[in-house]
From Swiss-Prot:
<comment type="function">
    <text>Expression of a cosmid containing the full 21-gene pdu operon in E.coli allows E.coli to grow on 1,2-propanediol (1,2-PD) with the appearance of BMCs in its cytoplasm.</text>
</comment>
<dbReference type="InterPro" id="IPR030984">
    <property type="entry name" value="PduB"/>
</dbReference>
<dbReference type="GO" id="GO:0005198">
    <property type="term" value="F:structural molecule activity"/>
</dbReference>
<comment type="function">
    <text>The two proteins produced are among the major shell proteins of the bacterial microcompartment (BMC) shell dedicated to 1,2-propanediol (1,2-PD) degradation. Overexpression of the gene gives large amorphous intracellular structures; when only PduB is overexpressed large circular bodies are observed which contain concentric rings, whereas with PduB' overexpression internal bodies with regular straight-lined structures were generated. The N-terminus of the long form (PduB) is required for correct formation of BMCs. May play a major role in binding the enzyme contents to the shell.</text>
</comment>
<dbReference type="InterPro" id="IPR037233">
    <property type="entry name" value="CcmK-like_sf"/>
</dbReference>
<protein>
    <recommendedName>
        <fullName>Bacterial microcompartment shell protein PduB</fullName>
    </recommendedName>
</protein>
<feature type="domain" description="BMC circularly permuted 1">
    <location>
        <begin position="47"/>
        <end position="152"/>
    </location>
</feature>
<comment type="similarity">
    <text>Belongs to the EutL/PduB family.</text>
</comment>
<dbReference type="InterPro" id="IPR000249">
    <property type="entry name" value="BMC_dom"/>
</dbReference>
<dbReference type="Pfam" id="PF00936">
    <property type="entry name" value="BMC"/>
</dbReference>
<feature type="domain" description="BMC circularly permuted 2">
    <location>
        <begin position="154"/>
        <end position="262"/>
    </location>
</feature>
<keyword id="KW-1283">Bacterial microcompartment</keyword>
<comment type="pathway">
    <text>Polyol metabolism; 1,2-propanediol degradation.</text>
</comment>
<dbReference type="InterPro" id="IPR044870">
    <property type="entry name" value="BMC_CP"/>
</dbReference>
<dbReference type="GO" id="GO:0051144">
    <property type="term" value="P:propanediol catabolic process"/>
</dbReference>
<comment type="subunit">
    <text>Homotrimerizes to form a pseudohexamer with a central pore. The trimers pack into an array. Both forms interact with shell protein PduA.</text>
</comment>
<dbReference type="InterPro" id="IPR009193">
    <property type="entry name" value="EutL_PduB"/>
</dbReference>
Amino acid sequence: MSSNELVDQIMAQVIARVATPEQQAIPENNPPTRETAMAEKSCSLTEFVGTAIGDTVGLVIANVDSALLDAMKLEKRYRSIGILGARTGAGPHIMAADEAVKATNTEVVSIELPRDTKGGAGHGSLIILGGNDVSDVKRGIEVALKELDRTFGDVYANEAGHIEMQYTARASYALEKAFGAPIGRACGVIVGAPASVGVLMADTALKSANVEVVAYSSPAHGTSFSNEAILVISGDSGAVRQAVISAREIGKTVLGTLGSEPKNDRPSYI
């Protein structure tokens, strides 16, 4: 079967699924709630907010030292900052931060994507939220930590790599800062690792729906030299969602040829 025939076959399956959503079986063991997942571990430090999936830790600094603010070269100086950092995950954390700034009086002042994934093919993340009141910043980090149980839902991995999809009907300031996504419009993020899988996913997404390319990153151009290809798209919410789902299906199929069936650790939300 040629690659075009494979794409056509998967797109037909995706369109059928979108038109007639499948009934998902109720799992025997309910997954932990976002509240439980955020509070898996704790400590007595006032700066500590919580932990979450992806070796993620949330911290706050109520009154940042001015010398550190100068050295960090943040776009805006805030007295209080929130820190969302992880060994594994970039898209889930950016999407979670996007929800955090929608829900709180905070702003994303820095997003960095270190080469990490604990030796895997992708990124970790370091996201800084700023605010004039430490209670606002802490609340923003709390929201982001809770959102990670949702935003990790469409991350699928096996021993060979991973694929990741993110979708929102209304992009906010974190997606705008990270990728240049138009604020207020639907946005999708499509990631494939190894990068070869990501390139095919990107092509499939663009062929499956009428969407606009916002950004494209590859190992030597914008991914901190991770073995990933990343496509960010915008457009009508239905079209963006269809494009993301099409990319997910072909990505799972190809990644599965390199190892075991790719699995997600949280329920899919797209």
